[in-house]
Regions:
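Ligand-binding clefts of soluble mixed alpha/beta catalytic domains
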Residues: 1-535
Length: 535
């Protein structure tokens, strides 16, 4: 492969300015992530510990193989969306290694609102299951939750992608041979009781875990029977009498040891048709990425400088280098695994879109995973380009992205605007994973453009009615539009709503993509069948 020759001057004032700006964004990200990782209030955590329980993150750590990485999903989900701090939507989710196997871990955090399911908690749980299904990852559920958050029941209970979908997914994953393991370490109430009841194997902790469709208060109200939670649905009931649980644990440590032993018996073997070579570090330091990206998101730069700091040996065999130059495509390796890279280097023209579609066809035919690096304002507009067929050429790219059946991974490294988001494998196009950098922006268009469009429509309407609109009134009209777009395009607004799988520091991108690719190799790469490409 051809080694990328970097033109970056790491001693320049521009590099230092860019690096300083990115460092500030990364520092903010780390502060937010650390605050969310604490979980609930100090009082809630102390109460949890006083019951002899491990804190949720300690549970996850004890479950995983010592020293192994954990690819967390949605670490900042729900932040700022609900009254109080519902950090991480009250749940820890991610991919880790247990007994040598990659698994999806879903861990309730009872120190946050009792582990209750808010709408975003449901969305996060379902996203974790979606990742598990796509990549054929065994699921380990560390259950300690009071069930649905009742004040939000209309957004949690009845719809297709609400609480009930969790159990639908469990049943279908088990049917597909994707193991489901539950460890009941606390409350497991109402519909939540189906998590352990529908798992392949279930562990329950003595004097701590409880499983029941109706808790003691509801039983008393409905039948008049007075009974304790332990006598109604504790470990002795379910391990000795009902058979709902398969393994009886003395405490959290024992339960997690049992779960590790169960995963060790799953007899799952990662198989891949990829030509994997010995991994090599990039020739150019990933720590320099902060200095590559301009502090002004609108400023241009050569995206090859990013690729050079992500791929093995900084080697990249570029495809159609001289054609459609605003889209960079080519082959590389990440941790020895072959990938096809599609990266924005400007606005998308017809030639760029055709080139991208052609490259995706090549990767589909060869069974090579795709990595999208998004920094896109959209497709070119104007009468010349409409007459030239930009709509049908853009549709070719969107069709190719939509129908490609191999693993796709997206990192938003700058702007993600309008139809450019679609052509570059945004969330709607089912990338296996989608991450954002802290400088990223995502919106149907920029705030300035949105304000100008809406102002033009309003002015045209007023002029048609013979009304005047002063420049002062127009400015007052535009200001809140710009502010709203700026707020809603912010990466933290996106990640709170799980439009992505997390915000990551640029220098962590190679590692995150490597873990994502490794997880994807647990599932076979499907053959792609493309639809009609309008010529």
């Amino acid at each position: 492969m051809t080694k990328i020759v970097s033109a970056l001057d790491t001693a320049s004032a521009t590099f230092r300015e860019n690096a300083t700006a990115m460092d500030a964004l990364v520092d903010d990200l780390q502060l937010r992530t650390a605050a969310a990782a604490v979980g609930g209030s100090e009082r809630s955590r102390e109460k949890h510990l006083s019951r002899g329980k491990l804190l949720p993150r300690d549970r996850v750590e004890r479950l995983l193989d010592p020293g192994s990485p954990f690819l967390e999903i949605g670490a900042l989900a729900a932040n700022g969306m609900y009254e109080g701090n519902v950090h991480g939507a009250g749940m820890i989710a991610g991919i880790g290694r247990v007994s040598g196997r990659e698994v999806m871990v879903v861990c309730n955090d009872p120190t946050i609102k009792g582990g209750a399911y808010y709408p975003m908690t449901v969305k996060k749980h379902l996203r974790a299951q979606e990742i598990a299904m796509q990549n054929r990852l065994p699921c380990v559920y560390l259950v300690d939750s009071g069930g649905a958050n009742l004040p939000h029941q209309a957004e949690v209970f009845p719809d297709r992608d609400h609480f009930g979908r969790i159990f639908y997914n469990q049943a279908n994953m088990s049917a597909e041979g994707i193991p489901q393991v539950a460890v009941v370490m606390g409350s497991c109430t109402a519909g939540g009781a189906y998590v352990p009841a529908m798992s392949d194997e279930t562990v329950i902790v003595r004097k701590q875990g409880t499983i029941f469709l109706a808790g003691p208060p509801l039983v008393k109200a409905a039948t008049g029977e007075v009974i304790s939670a332990e006598d109604l649905g504790g470990a002795d009931v379910h391990a000795r009498t009902s058979g709902v649980a398969d393994h009886y644990a003395a405490n959290d440590e024992h339960a997690l040891h049992t779960a590790r032993r169960i995963v060790g018996t799953l007899n799952t073997v990662k198989q891949t048709d990829l030509d994997i070579t010995e991994p090599r570090e990039p020739a150019h330091d990933p720590a320099e990425l902060g200095g590559v990206i301009p502090a002004d998101i609108r400023a241009p730069y050569d995206v090859r400088e990013v690729i050079a700091r992500l791929v093995d040996g900084s080697e990249f065999d570029e495809f159609k280098k001289l054609y459609g130059e605003t889209l960079v495509t080519g082959f590389a390796r990440l941790y020895g695994m072959p990938v096809g890279i599609i990266a924005n280097n400007g606005i998308l023209f017809s030639e760029s879109a055709q080139k991208g579609a052609h490259f995706i066809q090549l990767c589909a035919q060869r069974g090579i995973p795709l990595v999208f690096l998004q920094n896109i304002t959209g497709f070119m507009v104007g009468s010349k380009y409409e007459a030239g067929g930009i709509a049908k050429d853009g549709a070719k790219l969107v069709t190719a992205v939509s129908t490609y059946r191999g693993p796709k991974f997206t990192v938003i490294i700058g702007g993600s605007y309008g139809a450019g988001n679609y052509g570059m494998c945004g969330r709607a196009y089912s990338p296996r994973f989608l991450f954002m950098w802290p400088n990223a922006r995502i919106s149907v268009m920029g705030g300035e453009q949105a304000a100008a469009v809406l102002a033009t429509v309003k002015r045209d309407g007023m002029e048609a009615r013979g009304e005047d609109w002063s420049l002062e009134d127009e400015a007052a009209f535009k200001a809140p539009v710009r502010e709203a777009y700026e707020a809603e395009g912010n990466p933290y607004y996106s990640t709170a709503r799980m439009w992505d799988d997390g915000i990551i520091a640029p220098e962590d991108t190679r590692r995150v993509l490597g873990l994502s690719l490794s997880a994807a190799l647990n599932a076979p790469i499907e053959k792609t069948k493309f639809g009609i490409f309008r010529m």
